């Protein structure tokens, strides 16, 4: 079986490496700062698990497969990563086509859902102001994932199963030159393999400036955690689902989990961000906007103190679809990335797909190919 070097131990790279190992490959996984580190797109404590995506996309079925795989590995490792609080989509936008067209896709994929009118929502979650909400979707089997912990667990399982993990950086020198002659590492060594997978998130364009470059653009995303009133459990994951609010903007949140506070963020793509050296400090403008929203949608949280902030990045493509493709000049080099703010949940399923593509010499889904970009190098 082949030796595969995987660069990046996040939600994509870690799961790709583990599935390759389970498929019989010899695997070496590399990461510059370690799984779940604070610079990574997969860092932080939590990520949302949802399947509502609209029409004409592969992600609802991918999420359905991911749900099954998360459950499978939870049982195998005897650890919980998916917290099935439910996910509530609140539709306040005049254009509700995404949500309406999602209902058919959810049913086809076997995802449980409920279509809700304002009355039942108000009765079930009185802590939410549904004043302008027209209707909603509840995905009861979805919720949130433990992000950092699951990335670390995947790498631990890889090593326990006989795979190799090294915390080293990969030099960009020579990566675009065919034929591919291996990796130069930050410890001065070189690594040669039969196949190479680069699943290095916001750094993919830096390592492959000619092939990827600005096709994947890191954006700065501010995250806020607010403290609910003392003794008030209405804003914890025992009394409130994960939620998304589709209005003029799209905001989302995760109820206080692990006692870290009430997580709120604006999904609007932020400014360009340098993931290695960028200062991870939130802006007052974003905080003001989120506070105004919080006061309206969750009135009891109007004066809640800000108890924690975080800056992560999206690795954004122009169409928000992933990149899964061979390097156009080197058949044994795979490029995987472009999570675009919604990739984490899909890690187990995407890893399974990519591992099969490599081991069976398959062809990737055209929606993820580099050729979809007019400016892509051929």
Residue ranges and their predicted role:
Residues 2-29:
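N-terminal Rossmann-like FAD-binding beta1-loop-alpha1 element of flavoenzymes
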Residues 6-7, 190-203, 351:
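Short hydrophobic core segments
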Residues 46-124:
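Dinucleotide-binding Rossmann-like beta1-alpha1 core, especially the glycine-rich loop
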Residues 22-42:
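Glycine-rich FAD pyrophosphate-binding loop
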Residues 18-23, 80-84, 195-198, 202-332:
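Active-site substrate-recognition segment that forms the wall
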Residues 293-378:
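C-terminal catalytic lobe of FAD-dependent flavoproteins
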Residues 72, 93-162, 166-167, 172-179, ...:
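Flavin (FAD/FMN) cofactor-binding and adjacent substrate-gating region
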Residues 12, 35, 203:
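Conserved Rossmann-like nucleotide-cofactor binding loop
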């Amino acid at each position: 079986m082949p030796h595969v070097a995987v660069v990046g131990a996040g939600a994509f790279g870690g799961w790709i490496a583990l599935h390759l190992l389970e498929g019989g490959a010899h695997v070496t996984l590399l990461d510059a700062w370690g799984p779940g580190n604070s610079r990574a797109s997969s860092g932080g404590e939590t990520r949302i698990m949802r399947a509502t995506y609209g029409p004409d996309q592969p992600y609802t079925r991918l999420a359905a497969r991911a749900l099954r795989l998360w459950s499978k590995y939870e049982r195998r490792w005897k650890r919980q990563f998916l917290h099935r609080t439910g996910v509530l989509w609140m539709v306040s936008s005049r254009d509700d086509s995404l949500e309406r067209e999602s209902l058919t896709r959810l049913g086809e994929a076997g995802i449980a859902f409920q279509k809700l009118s304002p009355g039942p929502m108000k009765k079930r979650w009185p802590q939410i102001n549904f004043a302008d909400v027209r209707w909603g979707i509840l995905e009861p089997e979805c919720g949130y994932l433990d992000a950092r912990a699951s990335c670390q667990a995947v790498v631990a399982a890889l090593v326990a199963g006989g795979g190799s993990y090294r915390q080293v950086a990969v030099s960009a020198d020579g990566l675009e030159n065919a034929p591919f002659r291996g990796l130069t590492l930050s410890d001065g060594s070189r690594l040669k393999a039969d196949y190479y997978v680069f699943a290095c998130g916001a750094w993919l364009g830096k390592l492959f400036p000619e092939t990827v470059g600005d096709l994947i653009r890191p954006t700065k995303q501010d995250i806020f955690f607010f403290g609910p009133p003392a003794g008030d459990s209405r804003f914890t994951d025992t009394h409130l689902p994960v939620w998304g609010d589709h209005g003029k903007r799209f905001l989302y949140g995760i109820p206080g989990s692990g006692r870290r506070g009430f997580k709120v963020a604006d999904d609007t793509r932020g400014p360009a961000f340098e993931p290695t050296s960028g200062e991870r400090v939130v802006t007052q403008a974003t905080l003001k906007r989120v506070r105004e929203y919080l006061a309206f949608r969750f009135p009891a949280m109007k004066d809640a103190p800000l108890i924690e902030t975080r800056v992560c990045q999206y690795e954004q493509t122009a169409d928000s679809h992933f990149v899964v493709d061979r390097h156009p000049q080197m058949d044994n080099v795979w490029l995987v990335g472009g999570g675009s703010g919604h990739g984490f949940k899909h890690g187990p399923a995407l890893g399974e797909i990519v591992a099969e593509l490599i081991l069976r010499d398959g062809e990737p889904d055209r929606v993820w190919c580099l050729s979809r970009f007019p400016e892509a190098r051929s």
